[in-house]
C-alpha cells in the first residue's frame, strides 16, 4: 500500500514473514510474475493493521492461518524497489500457525517450498537471503531489505 500525502513522496508499506515448521525449515514462495523465491507477504491494504495484513497475505500466498502472534523482527527500507517502500518483517513459529487446507498454487503463486535456512536455494531474492543469514548468524539486522 502507498499513502500519498499532498506535496510529498508516497510512503509504501508491506509485510513478509519467515514461517517455520517443526523441522526448523522456512517457507518460501515463487510468484508467477517475478523471478526468485520470497518470504510470503505483500502490501498493507487501506484500513488494515500490519498484523491483519500479514495474516491475509499468508493465507492467500501460502495457505497458512495464524493461530498465535507473529514475532516482530523489524522494518526495512526497500528503496531499491521504490524510494519510500518499507517492509515489516516477522517470524512465525511452528506452534503459531496451521494449514488452511487450501492450495494457493494458481494465478499468483507457482511454487511453495520449505528450505533449511542454512542452505537456501540459489534463486532466493537478495532481501530474502539477507534475512535468512541473519536468522542463522544472529546479530543486528541490516536496515535495508
Segments the model singles out, each with a brief description of its role:
Residues 65-74:
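A short coil-to-beta-strand element that immediately follows conserved catalytic motifs
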Residues 1-16:
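Acidic, metal-coordinating catalytic segment for phosphate/diphosphate chemistry
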Residues 19, 89-93, 113-116:
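Short, well-ordered beta-strand micro-motif
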Residues 76-101, 131, 135:
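Active-site-adjacent beta-strand/loop module that shapes the phosphate/pyrophosphate-binding cleft
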Residues 21, 25-61:
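Conserved Nudix-box catalytic region and its N-terminal flanking loop in Nudix hydrolases
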Residues 36, 106-145:
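Nudix hydrolase/Nudix homology domain
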Residues 11, 68, 84-86:
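Residue-level preference for beta-strand/loop junctions
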Amino acid at each position: 500500500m502507498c499513502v500519498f500525502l499532498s506535496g510529498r513522496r508516497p510512503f509504501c508499506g508491506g509485510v513478509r514473514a519467515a514461517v517455520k515448521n517443526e523441522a526448523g525449515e522456512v517457507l518460501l514462495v515463487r510468484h508467477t510474475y517475478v523471478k526468485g523465491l520470497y518470504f510470503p507477504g505483500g502490501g498493507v491494504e487501506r484500513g488494515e493493521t500490519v498484523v491483519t495484513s500479514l495474516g491475509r497475505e499468508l493465507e492467500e500466498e501460502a495457505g497458512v492461518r495464524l493461530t498465535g502472534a507473529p514475532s516482530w523482527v523489524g522494518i526495512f527500507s526497500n528503496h531499491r524497489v521504490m524510494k519510500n517502500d518499507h517492509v515489516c518483517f516477522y517470524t512465525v513459529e511452528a506452534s503459531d500457525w496451521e494449514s488452511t487446507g487450501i492450495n494457493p498454487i494458481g494465478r499468483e503463486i507457482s511454487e511453495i517450498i520449505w528450505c533449511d535456512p542454512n542452505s537456501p536455494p540459489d534463486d532466493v531474492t537478495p532481501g530474502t537471503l539477507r534475512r535468512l543469514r541473519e536468522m542463522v548468524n544472529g546479530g543486528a539486522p541490516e536496515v535495508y531489505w
